[in-house]
Amino acid sequence: QKKGFCAGYCSYSCAKTDEWTFHQTCGKMYCCIPPPKKG
């Protein structure tokens, strides 16, 4: 399933705990997806 937006945030550098992917809305930046918060 393709969403029309990055599920996390667009950045040139993601946090070490983030998953990352490429997304068209982020252009040349990464789409950083933070892990789900526990608690």
Swiss-Prot record:
Superkingdom to which the source organism belongs: Eukaryota
GO cellular component: extracellular region
Residue(s) carrying Pyrrolidone carboxylic acid: 1
Temperature dependence: Denaturation temperature (Td) is 101.2 degrees Celsius.
Disulfide-bond pairs as recorded: 6-32, 10-26, 14-31
Coiled coil (residue ranges): none
Subcellular location: Secreted
The entry's keywords: Disulfide bond, Pyrrolidone carboxylic acid, Secreted
Family named by the database record: Belongs to the transferrin family.
Name of the molecule in the record: Small basic protein 1
Source organism of this protein record: Anas platyrhynchos
Top-level taxonomy: Eukaryota, Metazoa, Chordata, Craniata, Vertebrata
